[in-house]
Amino acid sequence: MQGAVIVLVLFGITSGGEALHLLHLPATSNVAENAPPATLVHKFSVNLSVSLSPVIPGFPLVVNPRPFTEAFRVNRLSATNFEVVTTGKEQLDFERGPKAFDLQIYVKDDVGVTDVQVLTVQVTDVNEPPQFQGILAQGLNLYVIERTNPGFIYQVEAFDPEDTSRSIPLGYFLISPSKNFRMSANGTLFSTTELDFEAGHKSFNLLVGVRDSGNLEASTALQVTIVNINDETPRFTSPRRVYSVPEEVPLGTMVANITAMDPDDEGFPGRLLYSITTTSSYFMVDQLTGTIQVARRLDRDAGELRQNPIISLEVRVRDRPSGGQENRMQITFIVEDINDNPATCRKLTFSIMLPERTANGTLLLDLNKFCFDDDSEAPNNKFNFTTPSGAGSSRRFSQHPAGSGRIVLTGDLDYENPSNLAVGNVYNVMIQVQDAAPPYYKKSIYISILTRPENEFPLIFERPSYVFDVPERRPARTQIGQVRATDADFPRTPVVYSVSRGGSSLQYPNIFWINPKTGELQLITQADHETTSVYILTVEATNGEDRSSVTVTVNILGENDEKPVCTPNFYFMAIPVDLKVGTNIQNFKLTCTDLDSSPSSFRYSIGSGNINNHFTFSPNAGSNITRLLLASRFDYSSLDTVWDYQLLVHITDDNLLSGSTKAKALVETGTVTLSVKVIPHPTTTITTPRPRITYQIRRENVYSTSAWYVPFIVTLGSILLLGLLGSLMVLLSKAVYRHCSSTTRRDRKPLTKKRDTKRMNREAMVESIQMNSVFDGEAVDPVTGEIYEFNSKTGARRWKGPLTQLPNWPEPSTQHRGTAGEAPVPKHTGR
């Protein structure tokens, strides 16, 4: 920086004419230490250049002071006059700071001409008064424990810039003398007497002065506070020692106030701490105020207080939480009994059931066995009972003697009595138990007395016997009749009905059902007059106490509900084409029966299949036996074209009915099927093959893509089975290894108990084809003339008579298949 200033100066000199320069500089000036701000240090002026260019505002200024400082600045007085003053930013201290500063004054005008000169400022020494350092300069609080022996309290120290640096001692003294304190010349504060907190001042204010060699002084304040120590025992000030407390006072109720004082803390009672030293959960003490409050329910009538109502406590007062001084006092509380428990009972509701024939004067209930009063002292624990009340109970129940709580019966309890029925045979009695002492607490007792009915009357049916008629065609659930049994006893108990005997048929163990609640008799299935026309039943009724029975006769009224049944039901006949008219075809005879119709009531007619009316029956009515006759000859050259006739024969049981009654009467019709084959004139010898049955079994495996889950499940099951077998093999190998690695001594006992093998019965699923072996038709072989029997449903045939046993014919192969249009030949099933 100094090199830059020199360059500027040379530039100004070489610019031509008389140069800008500072007057009265360089120079040396003095300034006193601790000079205040704006203190004049030196004045100087500026000689302008020939051009008279003014000094730039802000110049001259101090640059590069040595040592560096901000304690000085240049003030402008006029255009050419200036002064150097102190700034106050830094304290000029002769003893601790620089004693001289070299200030370079730099000036510059508008045309750039500059000049630099040096001002040397010397700091001069000034005698300063001594100073107290730190918090001592602001005043100091000193604490002295009471009853401390007289002696040293504190060492006061001050600083003087001149004397301290030259090791000249300062002088200390008390500006305000005290008989309790003194101070030495070197600044030591002593106490001259023993200080007592309770007897004298609690604190002292001292003014301490210090003087240097130039007689300059300084002072500071000392406050000496006497610290109280705990040297006095607290004293109880409450005179009372016995207190009476009513029981059941609310928790937190103040029952006593213990007060005490401590001479050490006179005027500050809140500094004492109270506590209860004896073990008691009934009371607690506020440790700050000494008030004793109820901490637990005071029940004079229960627990230890019922035996001993006196509670003794020891109260301790201390002047600090731990250590210190303490005092103790014994106080006593007497818990007084009050009438706080109403007379009560272990049960407040009673239910009594009495037989209806209970005698008057019977003791029903003694309330004294259930009621009590928990109060501990008389008269609080005495009680009595009020007069019983309740609708309808005044003439039936009372106390004997009055107020004793002994309830006795005084009226009639007949269950069937209308007045008793009006109240439902239930009597609600209310009686109150109350205290004998104020405030006369009461509690209500409710007694419900129920009359238990007794079985006085038998259970009887309304009639000694019952007779019902029912037509045989009535369906199941048809109501036949109703029986009813009653009991004069109240309450009415439900009667349960049952059929104990009778009513069985060949197919059913009982065709009758009786409603167990209503006694209504119904049909389970249709009855059959022809099988059983009269049923005699025994119906039993019970109400849980009694049992009674009655005979019920059910007449099954007959109706025409059976169809005529004829034999044979199906028949096959073969006749030659030239059979004579009026011939009984193959001596065929039809025999019919009807369970509910006479033989003369049958009428025969041919329905479908009698083409051109070639066939008729004789007789066609009035008999149960008829024959099939040829009514007209066959003419295949003209109208006839059918060779096989399937005749549906109707047998009706209305022959005896007139035209007016036939429309209203029940008519049944049976049917018979006849097969007649007309045999043409033979041109060659016809051999009749033996009848046989050919079975063709065809098996075919077809795979459907929609059944993908079948192989998937099979595969998954196989994998799981293999995994299970593998795990079992591993477990087996481990078990064998453990067994083999153990002792080789033969075990006396078997490792496992032998299990009983269970016999497994395998059920074989057999698919059988049941052939109908009933041969219900006969026919004549037109070639041999022999008679054979046949089954109309399966087509099976067998020879009748000595040809029953036939030799076995070779069976055709099951793989044989007939050609198109070839019907399988039935297999002979002769027996």
Curated annotation (Swiss-Prot):
Residues 743-763, 798-831 are annotated as: Disordered. Residues 749-763 have a biased composition (Basic and acidic residues). Residues 1-19 form the signal peptide. Keywords: Calcium, Cell adhesion, Cell membrane, Glycoprotein, Membrane, Repeat, Signal, Transmembrane, Transmembrane helix. Residues 733-831 are cytoplasmic. It is found in: Cell membrane. One of its GO terms (biological process) is homophilic cell adhesion via plasma membrane adhesion molecules. Residues 805-817 have a biased composition (Polar residues). Residues 24-132, 136-236, 237-344, 346-466, 462-570, 567-693 form the Cadherin domain. Glycans are attached at N47, N186, N257. Pfam families: Cadherin. It is a single-pass type I membrane protein. The keyword Transport does not apply. InterPro entries: Cadherin-domain_protein, Cadherin-like_dom, Cadherin-like_sf. The chain crosses the membrane at residues 712-732. GO terms for molecular function: calcium ion binding. Residues 20-711 are extracellular. Its main location: membrane. GO terms for cellular component: plasma membrane. Gene3D superfamilies: Cadherins (2.60.40.60). Disulfide bonds: none annotated. Cadherins are calcium-dependent cell adhesion proteins. They preferentially interact with themselves in a homophilic manner in connecting cells; cadherins may thus contribute to the sorting of heterogeneous cell types. This is Cadherin-related family member 3.
